[in-house]
């Protein structure tokens, strides 16, 4: 396929490619105004075309069947990763639980969204497989308890691999208050596997930590990082 730089004031990037229903291929794209950084809305299939290279190395224009804004038309698969290391004990974990529960309340389960809950401390634990049951997920969140060390990179790596096996749009959202101190994986391992599967990683940081590593992971995988104090809505 051939990528052509847009002629207007738009910043276009391909986030994910889903070929699970080949020959139908879905592209998930970020399209933002170059000046304001805001998402450009009200775009339909007439705004897009794709050139595919044929057996003779010539590019042939392909039909774009439809173009829809993700949060309106397409199911989303999310692996939600919760830090339950010792430093999260007390108010940090309670704050994270509140934001995670708020997020569950905003998920469009009736549209096909699925959420998986993964926790980590000294090790990585699958708390709940991909589910559309908001009550069960909220209960699992409320039952989280703290452990000891911080295996952040191992948890992110595991979450990326698991959500990558799902079809459609996918991402990882992690909540953490500290730097990794116990993983076998490295930051680079997380970035590489996320980019291999085109899975963006979003990180919500709790408290004052060294933002450099989490910023690298988020920005290098097409995600973003936020401080929990700035997060009022996850929808």
Regions of interest found by a model, annotated:
Residues 9, 26, 45-47, 114, ...:
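Exposed beta-strand and adjacent loop surfaces of beta-rich binding modules
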Residues 14, 19-79, 84-93:
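Acidic, polar low-complexity linker/tail segments
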Residues 76, 82, 89-104, 109-204, ...:
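Exposed acidic/Ser/Thr-rich ligand/metal-binding surfaces
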Residues 9, 60-63, 172:
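Small/flexible residues
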Residues 4-6, 19-21, 42, 109, ...:
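A generic structural signal for short, solvent-exposed coil/turn residues
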Residues 1-10, 16-25, 219, 226-235:
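C-terminal "exit" segments of structured domains
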Residues 1, 36, 199-200:
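Composition-driven recognition of long, C-terminal low-complexity regions enriched in serine/threonine
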């Amino acid at each position: 396929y051939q990528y052509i730089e847009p002629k207007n004031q738009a910043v276009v990037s391909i986030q994910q490619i889903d070929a699970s229903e080949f020959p139908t291929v879905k592209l998930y794209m970020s399209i933002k105004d170059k000046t304001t950084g805001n998402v450009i809305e009200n775009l339909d299939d007439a705004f897009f075309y794709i050139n595919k290279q044929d057996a003779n190395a010539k590019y042939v224009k392909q039909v774009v069947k439809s173009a829809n804004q993700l949060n309106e038309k397409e199911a989303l698969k999310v692996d939600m990763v919760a830090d339950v290391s010792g430093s999260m004990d007390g108010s940090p974990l309670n704050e994270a639980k509140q934001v995670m529960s708020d997020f569950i309340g905003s998920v469009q389960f009736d549209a096909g969204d699925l959420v998986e809950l993964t926790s980590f401390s000294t090790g990585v634990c699958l708390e709940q497989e991909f589910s559309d049951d908001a009550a069960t997920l909220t209960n699992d969140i409320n039952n989280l308890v703290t452990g000891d060390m911080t295996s952040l990179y191992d948890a992110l790596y595991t979450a990326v691999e698991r959500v990558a096996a799902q079809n459609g749009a996918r991402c990882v959202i992690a909540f953490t208050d500290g730097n990794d101190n116990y993983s076998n994986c490295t930051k680079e391992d997380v970035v590489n596997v996320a980019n291999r599967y085109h899975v963006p990683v979003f990180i919500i940081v709790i408290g004052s930590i060294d933002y450099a590593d989490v910023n690298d992971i988020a920005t290098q995988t097409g995600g973003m990082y936020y401080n929990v104090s700035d997060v009022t809505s996850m929808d």
